[in-house]
Amino acid sequence: MVFTFKNKKKKKEASSDKVSKESFNEEDNENNEKREKSDSWYKKIIETKGKSKTKYKNDNSLDDNINEDIINNNNNNNNDNNNDNNNDNNNDNNNDNNNDNNNENNNDNNNFNNYSDEISKNIIHKDNELENQLKDTLKSISSLSNKIVNYESKIEELEKELKEVKDKNIDNNDYENKLKEKEDFVKQKIDMLNEKENLLQEKELDINKREKKINEKEKNIIKKEETFHNIEKEYLEKNKERETISIEIIDIKKHLEKLKIEIKEKKEDLENLNKKLLSKENVLKELKGCVKEKNETINSLNDNIIEKEKKYKLLEYELEEKNKQIDLLNKQEKEKEKEKEREKEKEREKEKEKEYDTLIKELKDEKISILEKVHSIKVREMDIEKREHNFLHMEDQLKDLKNSFVKNNNQLKVYKCEIKNLKTELEKKEKELKDIENVSKEEINKLINQLNEKEKQILAFNKNHKEEIHGLKEELKESVKITKIETQELQEMVDIKQKELDQLQEKYNAQIESISIELSKKEKEYNQYKNTYIEEINNLNEKLEETNKEYTNLQNNYTNEINMLNNDIHMLNGNIKTMNTQISTLKNDVHLLNEQIDKLNNEKGTLNSKISELNVQIMDLKEEKDFLNNQIVDLSNQIDLLTRKMEEKENKMLEQENKYKQEMELLRGNIKSSENILNNDEEVCDLKRKLSLKESEMKMMKEEHDKKLAELKDDCDVRIREMNEKNEDKINMLKEEYEDKINTLKEQNEDKINTLKEQNEDKINTLKEEYEHKINTMKEEYEHKINTLNEQNEHKINTLNEQNEHKINTMKEEYEDKMNTLNEQNEDKMNSLKEEYENKINQINSNNEIKIKDVVNEYIEEVDKLKVTLDEKKKQFDKEINYAHIKAHEKEQILLTEMEELKCQRDNKYSDLYEKYIKLIKSICMIINIECCDDIENEDIIRRIEEYINNNKGLKKEVEEKEHKRHSSFNILKSKEKFFKNSIEDKSHELKKKHEKDLLSKDKEIEEKNKKIKELNNDIKKLQDEILVYKKQSNAQQVDHKKKSWILLKDKSKEKIKDKENQINVEKNEEKDLKKKDDEIRILNEELVKYKTILYNLKKDPLLQNQDLLSKIDINSLTINEGMCVDKIEEHILDYDEEINKSRSNLFQLKNEICSLTTEVMELNNKKNELIEENNKLNLVDQGKKKLKKDVEKQKKEIEKLNKQLTKCNKQIDELNEEVEKLNNENIELITYSNDLNNKFDMKENNLMMKLDENEDNIKKMKSKIDDMEKEIKYREDEKKRNLNEINNLKKKNEDMCIKYNEMNIKYGDICVKYEEMSLTYKETSLKYEQIKVKYDEKCSQYDEIRFQYDEKCFQYDEINKKYGALLNINITNKMVDSKVDRNNNEIISVDNKVEGIANYLKQIFELNEEIIRLKGEINKISLLYSNELNEKNSYDINMKHIQEQLLFLEKTNKENEEKIINLTSQYSDAYKKKSDESKLCGAQFVDDVNIYGNISNNNIRTNEYKYEEMFDTNIEEKNGMHLSKYIHLLEENKFRCMKIIYENENIKSSNKIIGLYNYSRYYGLREDLCKEEIVPSKIGNISNKNENNNKKNNTCDGYDEKVTIVLCIILNEIIKFLFLNDEYVLLFEKIHKNVWKRMYIPEEIKFFILKYITLLNNLRDYIISVHNNMKNEKYDECWFLFQHYFERSSDVRKEMVHFLLERKSQENLISFKSKLKSKKEKILTMDILNFSKEHMQLKTIAHLRKEINYEKLSKDTLNRDYNLLLYKYQECVSKLKRVKNLMKEINQNVFIEKYDDISKELDNFSDGYNEQNEQHVMDPILLNNNKNKNNKLITEHNNPIINRLTNFTQNRDSKYKNKIMDDVKQRKINSTMNNTNKNGINIIYNHYENLNKPNYNDNINRLNSYHQNIHIANSIHPNRNQNKSFLTNQANSTYSVMKNYINSDKPNLNGKKSVRNIFNEIVDENVNKTFVHKSVFF
């Protein structure tokens, strides 16, 4: 979008060029017309005056004067032009004064016109007297005119010649240089634009890549959303299940109701029985018993109710406590989250690019948190369901009690009726009852007891019906049977007793009367109990209703929370997509804002520079004014002198005229006198001219000054308008607030103003007088200066006019040529840029169409999802209609939310009031002239007010004294007023003191409250967000009712406030000025107290407030029928659907608006750039035009000024003086005003920006921190759980491994037994072998004598010998010798037979050796498994410790974070500085403490990475003896460390391994003298064949202490360098001396790790080649980008490199390990090589690291540069791999490879992969236990002649091939070590140092065998190598002698110690009796 700017720029340049050309053409035409007019004037003069031929004597003098005048005029014009150019701010670089020719001609014309006019005037006055003189003058004029014409013609000719010469001789060099400079400038701009285009393209590529990543992440989010929807479906299914359960509960209730009906029927039967029984005599006694029992049951029920109430209260308290605990935990979590977020701000500053990824992760975490909340809500719902069951149980109990109570009342009524009937019957049967009394009492009491027991059972059943539901049927059946039996018995008894009752009636009549009295009493008591019981039941019902309401509230809250969470989920899904759209817009906005900020900074700089320039100009103007004032004084003096001279001359003229009248006849004789007079007239004309010029100059200065002032005024007006527009609203508010105060202050300050006016009037009068005096003096000086200047500057004007004409013509021509060339260049560029721009626009449009389609598709998917969710929610609403009676209580919740909203509004109002009163204080300070900027804190303002009050106490006393003086005359009338005033004043002083103290004490409280207000504001914001959600669900009608009530409260509060304000105003009017301030302070204090009370109330628990509100609300008004609720819910559903449809339409509109706004923003930015360029161009054009216009105006004004008279000068001087005064005053005012405005503007800008930045940044940071801390806490908890699981798994694995270990030990013991048996057989074979070897040596000596005769014949049979084995070669050669040596010697046959016997015997020995090797391999396998298990145990223990340390560290950080959060609000700025300091330290420690694999490194390890020194001198010779301590010293200096084992755990008896610690130090080897001596074998000279026994005298190395184990450690930083194959490190690695290598112990893990890394590089090389071949048509940069992308995301290896390897090597996975050994091509693929994750090997490029450090703008350049560097490094790596392989080849040179004994072959194996199964088959020669047998003994030396013959045989061999034997030995050592690999790589390389004293016994046997087997082969392969024969033979003899001496004398003790091998597979110090397991400080 940037290219639109360029095309328009060039079009505008072309248009401006055309305009400039047209303007110049018009000006040329005007100049030509003016010239023609001037020429016509001269021609007329010549025609009229050409006839006069008389000459005047003074023609020459006149000519000279004229020339001088012309020169002066030219000089003056030059000076004027220079002054004009300086005033125009140096903008005339290419355009000069184009109209100078016209000026010159006009000046000449004007001069001559004036001259002719003056002459004509003199002639008119002197027609009669001076006719002769006029004739002479006419002659002189004509002659002068002719000369002038001639001069002009000559001048024109000369000008033409000059033009021709200049055209020829123009300096082409200057012109070309200028053109080149401009071309270079244009090229630079073009290059800059191209660079910008490239940067834009690069950014577009980066943006596209990021969009791809974002799209991928969105897909992942969509998948997770699907999972979330599935969870929601499951939740709905569970709701369905819940509904089914509820239906079952309803069915159970129905069954219970049926049972209750049955119970009622049975109760009715019982009641019938009771009626029959009550009809008998003892009914009264039964009633008494019933009453007592019922009282007891009531008491028991009351007790139960009380207990349950206590339980409910306890539950309430527990709920409250749990809520408090939850709040505390939430606060703590928030505080912790805040602190952790602050710690993460440092990382976020370095990871701006990852912010978008983190946002998406946060959204995912929020989803997870929401799911957790949903789960918690489900749990709470389960609890609530349980409580519902309990409440239902209690309700059933209460219902049963009510029913029983009603029944009892009915029974009482029946009893009363029956009593009345019985009275009549009892009177009859009293007599009968008396007789039967004794018999019937016992029976009746039994029946009564049975009935009471049944009633108790029924009550108990009603209480515990749920527990006994299953047993009800059985009990009921039993009860029915019992009742039937009882009824039968009762009927029989009734029949018997009816007869007896008749007798008892009479007896009981008397008793009935007494009983009736008692019954009345009991009825009263019963009624009392009844009323109390009813009241208690009502209270219980009320409490139950309250609990039900609370329960419904809780249930509604949970349902609302669920709905909220669902809405939040949908909102988050929408926010994710909106965030993705906003990300792209924000990126563009960031770039645009950065550009705008830069522009604004530049504009600020320009404005500051302009302001400084204006200040300088103002100072210059002041200086110029002073200078002009001085000039005016001088000119006034000159004018006075001229006037005096003119008066004198006039007097003289009068005298002369009188003389001329008298002497007219003598005039012709007195010509000389007349000439003097004419001369005087000429001087006067000159003076007039000078005066006119000075006047013109003064006017020009005045006009320029006016223009500058006008510009300044315009600038000031513009700024004032801007400030007024910004501050209009604020000013209007302040006006309304402060009008009352201003009126009061006016009344206070009227006296002061009057006094000041009087003082100012006096001063003004004095200043006026002084100023008038100065003006008069200035006038006089000005007139004098004008006269002097006119005389000086006449001649200069003419010369300057001529010079300017030449310059103008030359500049025109040059300018035209330049413009033509530039137009041609710009047209070509414009065409090219148009084409490019159109292509790019087409590309952008195509890309935008694709993006728009994607957005539309996404939106359609979202709409479908919303539809699905809506359908689901509709189903939910349909189901929830059944539970409408529960939802009726939602209204209460809505009311609570509204109350909370109103509380928030109230709090906001109080905060607004607080701010208003602070503003009032500030306004008072402004009125009192106290500084109160926004930066100043409230405390400082109050302190300044106190200081002001203290300073003004003296003034108050003075005012009081004056008032007492004024009122002294009215003491009689106003004595009472004085008394009241004194009392009021005393009270005011006391109140002031009190208020001052209160203010000081309350300042601190205000600060604390401000802090709390900030916290409350944050809470209020959160609550507002929640309120918006609740509002959608609330009913409008109820809200309106409550709003009205609250509006009434507000109106009342406002009325109260108004009343108070009216009272305050009345008090203010009554009191005096001094008391008004005190009243204001009081009011402020009162309202501050109110504010504090409000804050204190806000601190209280919201639960109490809610309870108070609930008490006020009528609960009965909230109960509404279920049908109404259903209708309203349906209406809400319809409204909700409409809102959703609206929201969809709004979404479409918003997306369209966002797209349109982005396009408009881009277009506006382009337009802005275009307008800026147009303004720049127009400014240049306008400047040129202004210059031309100014020049034209100046010239016109000069012409007009010449025609004016001297009389106007005086008037102008007066006007100028007045204007100067005005301007001085105006300038002073403008300067002060501008300074004030600038200061205010700057202060307000700074304050606003500071506040905005602080508030916005703090809010954003705090929100982001809170979210991050929540996520981190969850992540930490998950980590804890994972670690615990891992620990448990590790423990289980450890137990399994222990079991396996025990099994392996058993197997190992069995193998050891077998090994001992084999070793015994081996001893026997070795003894036989030695005997045979002695005989063989004798035969060899004989064979050597014969060999010299048959050397030539042996060469013919080389090919045959190659095909067969070593032993067969010996047999064949012997046979060939036998066949051809029969003639010479018969002894050869016997020798051959013996050799064949020896060969057969040796074959048996080799077979035994192979079995021994196989057994050793099995032993090594077992030992490897054991060592791996121990290492795993150690690693588990270390991990446990590490986890415990992390837990402790987290606890400490939590405590520290809590402390930090407390201090955050008060000391945020200090904490931020401390954090910046701590971040540096933490960064440094983090680098030192972290290794490659995340392990903690030791602080003692040095980290100097770039300082290298050579490790050894390259010219060290192996032949000279060197001391090992020197090598160690060099190693210590070059990043190596020597160590010593200082602790050994010798208690472990099961294995021969050391478990201990390393002690390491800087110069450990030198301090302890560990390496005492080392004598390298001295130089071996040429030894003759006769010196056989010299080999026995070879020097051996001195042994070390047996207990010392030296270890060589390489530092971690050096390992990293080795991994990246640093040149210097590789050189160090190669220069290590072999003697050091031989004593070095390298752990197998490190060797395996190095080989893995080398193979990784090989695979990467193959991968690059394959990718490059596949992408033939694309750039190599893109290919490299893919390779770099592999490094950056190592987790996606399967997509890149593994996929490549699997495609090529898929068939090789089926090949077994044995096939690998047979063929080199068949190799196995594994994945271990490629599993270098970011935690283990961070293969990040330099560019990626720089991106993390926010070098986004330079990313492309760094990528290109890093690409080249990585290619270079890659080539170096390849070359270094070759070096390593060459080293391996040198070691393997001339060695016969068996199976996998070659290092280069092992590299090839690793290069394709390493199979984990191969580890079972790999041997570990380092841990070989070759010396386990204890029965071996040393064999003594055998000094037999056979040995001598063998030595002679070896000495006579060809020395060319002896090096092969040494290389063979070395190669075997290397192969045995390199084949031992381990899966786990170790961070630190430990190189084990041990002594090399004696070789291994088995190896020496193998050497001898290989030596004898390969002698003929060596001779046959290299027949032509005969150089250095003697040296090699001696070397070979020496090696053989060493072997022989070892066999004879140094045979190892098999009861001795284990052997340890170095990298060359040589045995290191057999005196070491134990292997070692390294357990170092580094782990």
UniProtKB/Swiss-Prot annotation:
What keywords were assigned to this record? Coiled coil, Host cell membrane, Host membrane, Membrane, Merozoite
Q: Where is the composition biased (Basic and acidic residues)?
A: 13-24, 31-42
The record's InterPro entries line, in alphabetical order, gives: VID_Regulator (IPR052884)
Region (Disordered), start-end ranges: 1-42, 54-116
The protein finds application as follows: Possible candidate for an effective malaria vaccine as determined by epitope response in sera.
Q: Where is the major localization of this protein?
A: host cell
Bridged cysteine pairs (disulfide): none
Tell me which GO cellular component terms the UniProt record holds: cytoplasm; host cell plasma membrane; membrane
> Which PANTHER family does the protein's record reference?
ORGANELLAR PROTEIN, PUTATIVE-RELATED-RELATED (PTHR35261), VACUOLAR IMPORT AND DEGRADATION PROTEIN 22 (PTHR35261:SF3)
Q: What is this protein called?
A: Repetitive organellar protein
